[in-house]
UniProtKB/Swiss-Prot annotation:
Cellular component GO terms, alphabetical: cytoplasm
Active site: 64, 133, 135, 140
Single biological process term from Gene Ontology: carbohydrate metabolic process
Annotated protein name in UniProt: Glucosamine-6-phosphate deaminase
Annotated keywords: Carbohydrate metabolism, Hydrolase
Top EC class for this record: hydrolase
PROSITE patterns, alphabetized: GLC_GALNAC_ISOMERASE
NCBIfam families noted in UniProt: nagB (TIGR00502), PRK00443.1-4 (NF001684)
GO terms for MF: glucosamine-6-phosphate deaminase activity; identical protein binding
Recorded catalytic activity of this chain's protein: alpha-D-glucosamine 6-phosphate + H2O = beta-D-fructose 6-phosphate + NH4(+)
Pfam family, any one: Glucosamine_iso
């Protein structure tokens, strides 16, 4: 695992966008996340598109979707990613995929999403955030490290965290369809971003704590190519910051970001 510390959320986003842009420029498949953390990264990617970066040969897969929200609902992730990112770049029609949260057979929707990822050749880089309880995607504590895309029940803490987007806790869906930890682990490169002091505990546990299903994000410790980029606030509970900074300052040229 490569841990990179930057001063501000903007610097986190700039580095993340630089990494993502390399994959996009090669027409690779990318995995997208929603939530507040990736927003600055998407803004940076939009700026790179305006400077000439094309997404025309890139296929994208979202991590998750709420069950029961139609695609045009303002809090569906299909709508959110369009509103915040994809409408501003040049993805080809049909190149951005979202789990089908309106399929009454959620088991079928999960299987179809897995098949779509496999048919595209897999995900080359997956952008991730982390919840305050350590969830990635909507893989809540206790999720199997081998799990695939499936129906999940949201943790009460996750529903409370997301209530700000819906206006009230009662409006937050209880169920989601999410890529599993096993699905996420198959991506070639995992790129997790975290900013803010409220993520410091989760960051410390996912990076330096034991690998545990109760801390789903700790699965990154098992991945062959995982990068964690955090700002100073999110890094505040890490014990090995001196080492992480030393590694970052002394990268060989072929490893430089």
């Amino acid at each position: 695992m490569d841990v990179v510390i930057r001063q501000t959320p903007k610097e986190v986003a700039q580095l993340a966008a630089t990494i993502m842009a390399r994959y996009v420029s090669e027409g690779k498949n990318i995995g997208l996340a929603t939530g507040s953390t990736p927003l600055l990264t998407y803004q940076e990617l939009i700026a790179k598109h305006r400077e000439g970066l094309s997404f025309a040969n890139t296929t994208a897969f979202l991590l998750d979707e709420y069950v029961g929200l139609p695609e045009d609902h303002e809090q569906s992730y299909h709508y959110t990613i369009y509103n915040e990112f994809t409408q501003y770049v040049d993805f080809a029609d049909g190149a951005v995929h979202t789990p089908d949260g309106m399929n009454p057979r959620t088991d079928e929707a999960g299987r179809e999403y897995e098949e779509a990822i496999e048919a595209a050749g897999g995900i080359d880089i997956q952008l991730l955030g982390v919840g305050t309880n350590g969830h990635v995607g909507f893989n809540e504590p206790g999720s199997s490290f081998d799990s695939l895309t499936r129906l999940k029940t949201l943790h009460p803490q996750t529903r409370r965290d997301n209530a700000r987007f819906f206006g009230s806790l009662e409006q937050v869906p209880i169920h989601v369809i999410t890529q599993g930890l096993g699905t996420i682990r198959r991506a070639g490169h995992l790129l997790l971003l975290a900013t803010g002091e409220n993520k410091a505990d989760a960051v410390a546990k996912l990076v330096e704590g034991p690998v545990s299903a109760m801390m789903p994000a700790s699965v990154l410790q098992l991945h062959r190519h995982a990068t964690v980029i955090v700002d100073e606030a999110a890094a505040s509970q890490l014990q090995e910051t001196e080492f992480y900074r030393f590694v970052d300052a002394n990268r060989p040229e072929w490893q430089a970001y």
